[in-house]
């Protein structure tokens, strides 16, 4: 293979979709090729996530600046990566992890490291003249993922009184990614009309979903079912429902209760919702450290719906392995910035798949126009993706990229939902 090495790395502070700073990174090779990446940021974060380095300077951006992370890219990572083969991703990532030297990447920042990791891989793809998904996944990269579309936002993604964070639809009856996007858009507009008729707000939350003032989680689910029907689809057959409870956000660690309820009561609430609505996936139904609750939830519902761990696993291969050994959940949410390198992200996906767990590639609530996760979902054949609602251009950019990939793949492309409980 042609020997091409890293010659330069640039970084700068940009803004994400919430108006807070994040990193843009550009890696250039001695062949003149380059790759670019923008790093996302979460609002609801797991306590064991890799550290997102912020300046803590209250005089700018409420302390959320990333100038130190930018400096770390230029002054620490560039010197140790200059001259390294652009094609040796494992070496590139291991050099950065070693340069940081901490378990959670707190010295240099996972945001600095991830930006360089992704931009390096994109530069390698550009050097070979390949699409990013094809460079990473080779000839096996051909599965278009089923989207999980967040149409009603609550929790930490909206200030509207809803306890759960995401109320999603999954167009399981679609035969192509393009059709899935169209179905989602139809339901989105149907829901907007319903909200207008009920004199409910149609402003949107961080991820592009509506954020009306509602009295209960059930009311949000009722609205989704009605929107699906009014758009001309059959709930549970054409389109199913999914939840992200983000239960850690309403868990009292001292009392070990969920808004005053025990983990047994919380599991019963979720089981009741599954009986009443066509739900086939629940994410973070229990708090990340409530292992007894996770065991019960998996035992009660793990044979009938997808039980997704996000805060529970934080895309960390060690935590995923531990969770698998405990029998917790049956699916893993994959967020590259939770772990900080492309190599570790790949390891997390491969580990989950090897043990029969499904994976869902996911955005963060603070996003940019970067479409990397669309390529990653196809590259690793995850079969599912979470990238928000059918509004806000930082969300739409990912759907548009997926449709472009589907067109590029042609007959090779396969739209396939990896959730084994779809439509049950």
From Swiss-Prot:
Gene3D superfamilies: Enolase-like C-terminal domain, Enolase-like, N-terminal domain
Active site (record annotation): 207, 335
Highest rank taxon of the organism: Bacteria
GO cellular component term, pick one: cell surface
Enzyme class: lyase
Subcellular location: Cytoplasm; Secreted; Cell surface
Cofactor binding note of this UniProt entry: Binds a second Mg(2+) ion via substrate during catalysis.
Keyword Lyase on entry: yes
Binding site for (2R)-2-phosphoglycerate: 165, 335, 364-365, 386
Secreted is among the record's keywords: yes
Catalytic activity from the UniProt record: (2R)-2-phosphoglycerate = phosphoenolpyruvate + H2O
Pathway participation: Carbohydrate degradation; glycolysis; pyruvate from D-glyceraldehyde 3-phosphate: step 4/5
Biological processes per GO annotation: glycolytic process
Cofactor (UniProt): Mg(2+)
Residue positions binding Mg(2+): 244, 283, 310
Gene Ontology molecular function, alphabetical: magnesium ion binding; phosphopyruvate hydratase activity
NCBIfam families xref list: eno
Entry similarity comment: Belongs to the enolase family.
Protein name as annotated: Enolase
Gene source species: Chlamydia caviae (strain ATCC VR-813 / DSM 19441 / 03DC25 / GPIC) (Chlamydophila caviae)
Lineage: Bacteria, Pseudomonadati, Chlamydiota, Chlamydiia, Chlamydiales
């Amino acid at each position: 293979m042609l020997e091409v090495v890293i010659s330069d790395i640039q970084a700068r502070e940009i803004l994400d979709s919430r108006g807070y700073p994040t990193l843009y990174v550009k890696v250039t090779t001695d062949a003149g090729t380059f790759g670019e990446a923008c790093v996302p940021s979460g609002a609801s974060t797991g306590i064991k996530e890799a550290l997102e380095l912020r300046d803590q300077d209250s005089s700018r951006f409420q302390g959320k600046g990333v100038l130190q992370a930018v400096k770390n890219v230029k002054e620490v990572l560039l010197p140790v990566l200059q001259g390294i083969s652009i094609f040796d991703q494992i070496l590139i990532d291991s050099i950065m992890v070693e340069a940081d030297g901490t378990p959670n990447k707190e010295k240099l920042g996972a945001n600095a490291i991830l930006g360089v990791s992704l931009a390096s891989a994109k530069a390698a793809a550009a050097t070979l003249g390949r699409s990013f998904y094809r460079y990473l996944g080779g000839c096996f990269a051909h599965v278009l993922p089923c989207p999980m579309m967040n149409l009603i936002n609550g929790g930490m993604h909206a200030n509207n009184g809803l306890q759960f964070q995401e109320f999603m639809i999954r167009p399981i009856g679609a035969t192509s990614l393009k059709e899935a996007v169209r179905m989602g858009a139809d339901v989105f507009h149907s829901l907007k009309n319903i909200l207008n008729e009920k004199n409910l707000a149609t402003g949107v939350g961080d991820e592009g979903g509506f954020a009306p003032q509602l009295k209960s989680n059930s009311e949000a689910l009722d609205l989704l079912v009605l929107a699906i029907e009014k758009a001309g689809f059959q709930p549970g057959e054409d389109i199913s429902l999914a939840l992200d409870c983000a239960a850690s956000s309403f868990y009292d660690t001292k009392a070990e209760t969920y808004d005053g309820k025990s983990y047994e009561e919380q599991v019963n609430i979720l089981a009741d919702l599954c009986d009443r609505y066509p739900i086939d996936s629940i994410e973070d139904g229990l708090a990340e450290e409530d292992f007894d609750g996770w065991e019960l939830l998996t035992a009660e519902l793990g044979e009938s719906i997808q039980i997704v761990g996000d805060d529970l696993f934080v895309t960390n291969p060690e935590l995923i392995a531990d969770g698998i050994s405990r029998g917790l959940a049956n699916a893993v949410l994959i967020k590259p910035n939770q772990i900080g390198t492309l190599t570790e992200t790949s390891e997390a996906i491969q580990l989950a798949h090897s043990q029969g767990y499904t994976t869902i590639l996911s955005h963060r609530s603070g996003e940019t126009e970067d479409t990397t996760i669309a390529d990653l979902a196809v590259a690793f054949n995850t079969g599912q993706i979470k990238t928000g609602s059918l509004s806000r251009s930082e969300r739409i950019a990912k759907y548009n990229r997926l449709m472009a990939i589907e067109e590029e793949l042609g007959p090779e492309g396969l739209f396939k939902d990896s959730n084994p409980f779809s439509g049950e």
